[in-house]
């Protein structure tokens, strides 16, 4: 079973993330940031991973620390659940449309953290959610999961649609990358022999 649980406690946030990479898309989400919960639900449902995330943060100031630290903790949990990466596909990609919006996400479990985030948001906020926090979420994730992640919103007018297609595509790309490949059972997916 590829399951991991990580707890992260700082003076700003207290976060617990549990993930099952071989799940069915079930989720239990309570981050205190409703729009973040909505986006995490997209990862679970479209990535077919089970997510149980609870966060308490200094949201009386703003949502920044909570959103960033959930990304960090999720990255740590994914890295722990993937383990030595033997037998995984390593790479994943997805294009996801939602009405006028279209996004592409490509991920590589390379062991080299890197984020290319190109989303020309049409608004600064979706409800009360600051769209810049999505960058902080993914930066925290890549730095602690040890992945290279390319996120491109190819078109979109509605900022909610733009970000929702990003999170859905991320879930689907993650699912593809961590999927076990029977033909590569027990092998590290790299000519170097390590990732």
From Swiss-Prot:
Predominant location category: cytoplasm
Catalysed reactions listed for this entry: D-erythro-1-(imidazol-4-yl)glycerol 3-phosphate = 3-(imidazol-4-yl)-2-oxopropyl phosphate + H2O
Transmembrane segments: none
BP GO annotations: L-histidine biosynthetic process
InterPro entries the UniProt entry points to: IGPD_sf, ImidazoleglycerolP_deHydtase, ImidazoleglycerP_deHydtase_CS, Ribosomal_Su5_D2-typ_SF
Enzyme Commission number, as recorded: 4.2.1.19
Main EC class the enzyme belongs to: lyase
Location of the protein in the cell: Cytoplasm
Entry annotated with the keyword Amino-acid biosynthesis: yes
UniProt pathway: Amino-acid biosynthesis; L-histidine biosynthesis; L-histidine from 5-phospho-alpha-D-ribose 1-diphosphate: step 6/9
Gene3D superfamilies cross-referenced by the UniProt entry: Imidazole glycerol phosphate dehydratase, domain 1 (3.30.230.40)
Tree of life domain: Bacteria
GO MF annotations, alphabetized: imidazoleglycerol-phosphate dehydratase activity
Gene Ontology cellular-component annotations: cytoplasm
Keywords: Amino-acid biosynthesis, Cytoplasm, Histidine biosynthesis, Lyase
Family: Belongs to the imidazoleglycerol-phosphate dehydratase family.
NCBIfam families: PRK00951.1-1, PRK00951.1-5, PRK00951.2-1, PRK00951.2-4
Stated name of the protein: Imidazoleglycerol-phosphate dehydratase
Source species: Burkholderia thailandensis (strain ATCC 700388 / DSM 13276 / CCUG 48851 / CIP 106301 / E264)
Source species taxonomy: Bacteria, Pseudomonadati, Pseudomonadota, Betaproteobacteria, Burkholderiales
